């Protein structure tokens, strides 16, 4: 028996008739399944035990031989071999077909492989196979052509004319088989290659396609005639089961019906042929057999699908593989697993970062085998069976054992949809009463979970290795940073933010203002006894606070508030005292203006200091990031728990509530509204007089109401009272934003109609005043549209993620350094005046490609091939450097992956990336996960300036990654040179731009409404846009090189995401874009044996040319091809990965013809065949580590081992 997990690769091919017979354990001759009286399988039927194996383990059909003793013996009564019933899942049968039958995949697929092999049109093939025409196989001496089609009538005429036997013509798949047998592949290939040198146009394309198929057959060793079946395999019966329902009826797999149709027709055909029936009857039966086999292989591919009960099309063999419910996606890529459960989640505010609460009755079921083993070990149960009974009875000792078993055994919690890797994290279980899983409040953001009825699944890692990995790599306390941008993902929210905001507020003139304390303990006593308030401004001796003071701050008195003393008491030692929400205070030290000498009057000092704003949500995130940067995970997760507890405690003490009286009233709201009404009347009058168009009127009216809403909003912000609880919630970032506030206190404003257009009638009321019936009706439109948009967007975004993961799943960090000499020059990404992504963010965590010098002094800031830290990046920016050359994924030479230096740091840990990290999947998740936050709409820019629609949001991201022609396309120049002239032509409402290059001059026509990006006399490089809009990347690739296209696409994706406030690290987009440009199309094959027009991986192409050059031959030339992610996924080298993605039958047909070998480099292929994935700890270099023998203790170790075995 081969070891299932040891093979290197997997090959697929076309099965020869001999192979099918070799697989088979016997011929299925009858369409019968089960005898309805005895409930036993019929002999020679579809469930025959003699062919497929016994239904019960170690027992023959008649019951004569029972037990393992008779292993592998064949019963002489019933002829059944004694073996396990599992063999019914493995043993195949076969049907000997009475006539050859064509395989529908090879005849009907696009392009028709049979047609290309024979140089016949698919239509001609169809006529022959389905007995509509004869095809000439051997014309002999007649004037007929080989492969010429003859109708029944022409055939008879030719027979009369030339005599019987003067030529050979046949019908059906038999004819096709004869023709396929006649093809001499080697001869055809050499003839076609000769012809290829001279022809052009359509004929050339046709020849290349034929050559492709023929050379595929030649290389793979498949015979052309195997595309026609003489023997049909029958799959094992347990894969097409038949089960009895209560009531004596049977439910059966559709395949059994399909097989029965084939067997019935095959048997009838045999009988007709034995009887020498008239030719027409036999032909009809053959055609019906052909159709039956077609239906079995792929129902509905040709003609109308065969339906079963209730007009449902039957599921054929092809449908078993296809789609979400097919074998690949349903059973191979995702399986249901044991040792799992699910329940509703509730908040666990008392838990530590690394803990979760697991209900006892869930835990007892999950940990059952562990508990049973412990019971036996502790001699609380005699054997496993007794232990099992004990657990089922839930005896009292079971619970104590459970406590010990659960200790330090991490569990995995997963919330669907799992959009990124933080959707599954490990926690240490804490047993609780009740039935809900308890989740740590800070883990919510990563899971995107809330407690309004969300459910979560729980899984148990079983083996020691799995537990170790869960503990070391997946523990929730380790996941402080978000892999997409390297920012903290566990920032406090809601109550925690509110409590800390309230704690750090300052108020002038609160009780006890100006008191000076010696120690923090004194402050606390004073507060407890009501001498001071949390917000009171006080002084405290710096020497009592264990903080890194500067020299001139020591032995002074710090002016701060009571709350801030408490807030700073939980911050790790070594961090500065935080007295104001500034970056300087956080990274270096507290500002000197907050310090006074012991003799000074504190009242005077306080009068000179303005009140400081409290700490909001964003600043808390900065503090966490700084703590992480200094102390890494353990200290950060401890600090987070302290911050959480403090926040909850203080918000409870603060007791903030909201009532209708807390919503402020804008006194002169009616004035603003009246002014708006007047302005709208003026606009309407202008329109009536014909001074403005209807579009202009519409834009002006909506503009007026927008301005009115903004004016009210501005008033609310200017007049807001910072002690108002609603304002506090909003200002702190705990809940709500200015738009919610302005709808409560200002006006609701304009609403969208069902068609997405904005209605001119605004909602003037706010929620405090209450809406009128009409206003309420209008708001329902917008609300309903919002809901549908969200639902559609989620599906779209999920599908985008699936395609992204598929195209990048085999990108893994495979080596330390690829040694490339190329790099990527980067600078700020900006659109016009607006900064999209500053250079600083693009530098941090990357390696340099060239050393960076100070522009003025010329001294070296950082050497070549060195990691850029935040501090160095800050130095580079401060020196005024505008461009830096860095190592980039785009220029990495590692085949099938990336190297450490081209990738840089792993954003999730802040350290250098490890070999084995699955960066492709992480990149795909980082781009897909925020997809739901992008808008669905394609924005209309409004106004007259630019009339074209510019796609934005999710549709734009899809457009970029699918490499489609963009809407609102920008015209680009194809030459480098100077803009000579821009001439307007009022008659045609166009402008002509002339660009003069060194060798030639080009002219481009653009519309009057287009916004120009160039001016006369400007020097531009080829590929530069002349007008505003999106460049078509495929056109850019023709004009410039691949790197320019990659850089452009990177910038475009960043613009789309950043405009919506989503930050994503460059490297993730680089990984995805590189996958779109992995292929080269061969233009001229030189002296290599590759076909022109072939798509090849860049690394394979370069290796091929290297070999050619070493042998002194002509290398091939090719041009890079830009593919959309769907196309790129289907063109991957792994047929398993492509088949499980989309177009399963097409991918498998093609792979079978080529005899493709899958080297199992990616993640998907290995998941499908059940091998450990070649990433992370499953990587080859980590799995084959032999422990070094320590020879000094060798004998003792052996003894210990034998003892454990005996135990």
UniProtKB/Swiss-Prot annotation:
Residues the entry annotates as binding Zn(2+) 1: 60, 62, 75, 78
Coiled-coil positions: none
Residues engaged in binding Mg(2+): 450, 452, 454
Domain of life the protein comes from: Bacteria
CDD domains: RNAP_beta'_C (cd02655), RNAP_beta'_N (cd01609)
Cofactor note (record): Binds 1 Mg(2+) ion per subunit.
InterPro entries the record matches: DNA-dir_RpoC_beta_prime (IPR045867), DNA-dir_RpoC_beta_prime_bact (IPR012754), RNA_pol_asu (IPR000722), RNA_pol_N (IPR006592), RNA_pol_Rpb1_1 (IPR007080), RNA_pol_Rpb1_3 (IPR007066), RNA_pol_Rpb1_3_sf (IPR042102), RNA_pol_Rpb1_4 (IPR007083)
S-S bridge residues: none
A Gene Ontology biological process term: DNA-templated transcription
Residues engaged in binding Zn(2+) 2: 818, 892, 899, 902
Quaternary structure note: The RNAP catalytic core consists of 2 alpha, 1 beta, 1 beta' and 1 omega subunit. When a sigma factor is associated with the core the holoenzyme is formed, which can initiate transcription.
Enzyme class: transferase
A single GO molecular function term of this UniProt record: DNA-directed RNA polymerase activity
Alphabetical list of PANTHER family matching this protein: DNA-DIRECTED RNA POLYMERASE, DNA-DIRECTED RNA POLYMERASE SUBUNIT BETA
GO cellular component: DNA-directed RNA polymerase complex
Keyword annotations: DNA-directed RNA polymerase, Magnesium, Metal-binding, Nucleotidyltransferase, Transcription, Transferase, Zinc
HAMAP family for this protein: RNApol_bact_RpoC
Name this protein carries in UniProt: DNA-directed RNA polymerase subunit beta'
Keyword Nucleotide-binding set for record: no
Described purpose of this protein according to its UniProt entry: DNA-dependent RNA polymerase catalyzes the transcription of DNA into RNA using the four ribonucleoside triphosphates as substrates.
Cofactor: Mg(2+); Zn(2+)
Enzyme Commission number(s) from the entry: 2.7.7.6
Reactions accelerated catalytically: RNA(n) + a ribonucleoside 5'-triphosphate = RNA(n+1) + diphosphate
Record-stated family: Belongs to the RNA polymerase beta' chain family.
């Amino acid at each position: 028996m081969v070891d299932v997990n040891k093979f290197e690769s997997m090959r697929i091919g076309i099965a020869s008739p001999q192979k099918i017979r070799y697989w088979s354990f016997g011929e299925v001759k009858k369409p019968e399944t089960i005898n309805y009286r005895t409930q036993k399988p019929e002999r020679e039927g579809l469930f025959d035990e003699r062919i497929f194996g016994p239904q019960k383990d170690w027992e023959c059909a008649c019951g004569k031989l029972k037990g393992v003793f008779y292993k592998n013996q064949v019963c002489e009564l019933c002829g059944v071999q004694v073996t396990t019933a599992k063999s019914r899942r493995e043993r195949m049968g076969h049907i000997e077909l009475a006539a050859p039958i064509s395989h529908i995949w090879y005849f009907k697929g696009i392009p028709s492989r049979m047609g290309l092999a024979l140089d016949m049109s698919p239509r001609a093939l169809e006529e022959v196979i389905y007995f509509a025409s004869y095809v000439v196989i051997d014309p002999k001496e007649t004037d007929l052509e080989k492969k010429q089609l003859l109708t029944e009538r022409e055939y008879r005429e030719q027979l009369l004319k030339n005599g019987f036997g003067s030529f050979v013509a046949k019908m059906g798949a038999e004819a096709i088989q004869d023709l396929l047998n006649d093809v001499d592949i080697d001869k055809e290939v050499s003839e076609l290659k000769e012809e290829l040198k001279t022809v052009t146009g359509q004929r050339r394309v046709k020849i290349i396609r034929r050559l492709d198929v023929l050379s595929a057959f030649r290389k793979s060793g498949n015979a052309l005639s195997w595309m026609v079946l003489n023997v049909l395999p029958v799959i094992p019966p347990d894969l097409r089961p038949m089960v009895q329902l209560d009531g004596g009826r049977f439910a059966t797999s559709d395949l059994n019906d399909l097989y029965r149709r084939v067997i019935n027709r095959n048997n009838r055909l045999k009988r007709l042929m034995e009887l020498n029936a008239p030719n027409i009857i036999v032909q009809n039966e053959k055609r019906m057999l052909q159709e039956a086999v077609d239906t079995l292989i792929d129902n509905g591919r040709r003609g109308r699908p065969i339906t079963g009960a209730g007009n449902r099309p039957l599921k054929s063999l092809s449908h078993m593989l296809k789609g979400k419910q097919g074998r690949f996606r349903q059973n191979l890529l995702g399986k249901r697993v044991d040792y799992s459960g699910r329940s509703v989640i509730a908040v666990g505010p008392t838990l530590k970062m690394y803990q979760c609460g697991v209900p006892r009755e869930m835990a007892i079921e999950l940990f059952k085998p562990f508990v049973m083993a412990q019971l036996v070990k502790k001699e609380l149960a005699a054997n496993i069976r007794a232990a099992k009974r004990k657990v089922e009875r839930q005896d009292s000792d079971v619970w104590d054992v459970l406590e010990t078993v659960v200790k330090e055994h991490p569990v995995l919690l997963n919330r669907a949809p799992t959009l990124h890797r933080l959707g599954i994290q490990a926690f240490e279980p804490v047993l609780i009463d009740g039935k809900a899983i308890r989740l740590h409040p800070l883990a919510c953001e990563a899971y995107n979970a809330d407690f309004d009825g969300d459910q979560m699944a729980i899984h148990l890692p079983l083996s020691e290795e799995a537990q170790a990995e869960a503990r070391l790599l997946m523990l929730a306390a380790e996941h402080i940073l978000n892999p997409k941008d390297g920012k903290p993902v566990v920032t406090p929210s809601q109550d925690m933010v509110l409590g800390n905001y309230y704690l750090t507020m300052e108020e002038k003139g609160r009780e006890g203002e100006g008191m000076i304390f010696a120690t923090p303990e004194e402050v606390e006593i004073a507060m407890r006894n009501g001498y001071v308030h949390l917000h009171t401004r006080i002084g405290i001796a710096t020497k009592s606070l264990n903080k890194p003071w500067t020299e001139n701050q020591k032995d002074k008195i710090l002016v701060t508030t009571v709350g801030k003393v408490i807030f700073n008491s939980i911050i790790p030692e070594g961090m500065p005292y935080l007295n104001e929400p500034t970056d300087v205070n956080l990274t270096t030290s507290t500002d000197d203006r907050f310090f006074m000498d012991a003799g000074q009057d504190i009242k005077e000092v306080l009068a000179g200091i303005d009140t400081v704003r409290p700490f909001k949500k964003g600043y808390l995130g900065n503090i966490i990031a700084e703590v992480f940067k200094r102390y890494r995970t353990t200290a950060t997760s401890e600090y987070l728990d302290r911050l959480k507890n403090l926040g909850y405690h203080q918000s409870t003490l603060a007791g903030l509530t909201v009532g209708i009286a807390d919503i402020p009233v804008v006194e002169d709201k009616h004035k603003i509204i009246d002014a708006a009404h007047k302005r709208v009347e003026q606009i309407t009058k202008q329109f009536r007089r014909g001074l403005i168009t209807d579009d202009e009127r519409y834009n002006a009216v909506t503009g007026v109401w927008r301005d009115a809403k903004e004016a009210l909003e501005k008033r609310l912000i200017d007049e807001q009272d910072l002690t108002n609880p609603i304002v506090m919630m909003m200002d702190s970032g705990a809940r709500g934003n200015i738009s919610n506030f302005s709808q409560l206190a200002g006006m609701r404003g304009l609403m969208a109609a069902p068609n997405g257009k904005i209605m001119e009638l605004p909602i003037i009321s706010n929620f405090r005043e209450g809406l009128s019936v009409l206003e309420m009706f209008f708001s329902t439109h917008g609300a309903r549209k919002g809901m549908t948009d969200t639902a559609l967007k989620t599906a779209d975004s999920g599908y985008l993620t699936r395609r992204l993961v598929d195209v990048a799943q085999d990108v893994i960090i495979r080596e330390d350094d690829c040694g490339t000499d190329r790099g990527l020059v980067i600078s700020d990404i900006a659109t016009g005046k607006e900064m999209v992504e500053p250079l600083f963010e693009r530098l941090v965590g990357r390696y340099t490609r060239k050393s960076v010098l100070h522009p003025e002094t010329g001294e070296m800031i950082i050497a070549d091939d060195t990691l850029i830290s935040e501090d160095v990046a800050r130095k580079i920016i401060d020196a005024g450097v505008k461009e830096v050359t860095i190592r980039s994924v785009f220029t990495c030479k590692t085949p099938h992956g990336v190297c450490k230096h081209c990738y840089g740091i792993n954003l999730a840990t802040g350290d250098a990336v490890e070999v084995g990290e699955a960066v492709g999947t992480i990149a795909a998740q980082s781009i897909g996960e925020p997809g739901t936050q992008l808008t669905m709409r394609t924005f209309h820019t409004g106004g007259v300036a630019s009339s074209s629609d510019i796609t934005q949001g999710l549709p734009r991201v899809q457009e970029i990654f699918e490499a489609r022609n963009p809407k609102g396309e920008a015209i680009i120049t194809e030459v480098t040179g100077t803009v000579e002239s821009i001439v307007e032509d009022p008659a045609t409402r166009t402008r002509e731009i002339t660009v003069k290059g060194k060798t030639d001059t080009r002219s481009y026509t653009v519309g009057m409404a287009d916004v120009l990006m160039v001016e006369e006399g400007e020097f531009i490089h080829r590929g530069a846009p002349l007008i505003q809009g999106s460049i078509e990347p495929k056109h850019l690739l023709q004009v410039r090189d691949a790197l320019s296209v990659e850089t452009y696409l990177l910038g475009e994706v960043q613009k789309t995401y950043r405009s919506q406030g989503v930050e994503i690290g460059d490297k993730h987009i680089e990984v995805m874009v590189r996958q779109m440009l992995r292929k080269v199309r061969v233009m001229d094959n030189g002296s290599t044996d590759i076909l022109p027009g072939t798509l090849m991986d860049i690394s394979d192409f370069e290796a091929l040319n290297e070999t050619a050059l070493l042998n002194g031959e002509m290398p091939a030339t090719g041009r890079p091809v830009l593919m959309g992610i769907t196309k790129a996924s289907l063109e991957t080298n792994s047929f398993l990965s492509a088949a499980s993605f989309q177009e399963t039958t097409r991918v498998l047909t093609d792979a079978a013809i080529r005899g493709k070998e899958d080297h199992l480099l990616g993640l998907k292929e290995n998941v499908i065949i059940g091998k450990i994935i070649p990433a992370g700890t499953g990587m080859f270099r980590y799995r084959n580590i032999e422990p070094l023998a320590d020879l000094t203790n060798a004998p003792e170790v052996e003894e210990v081992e034998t003892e454990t075995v005996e135990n």
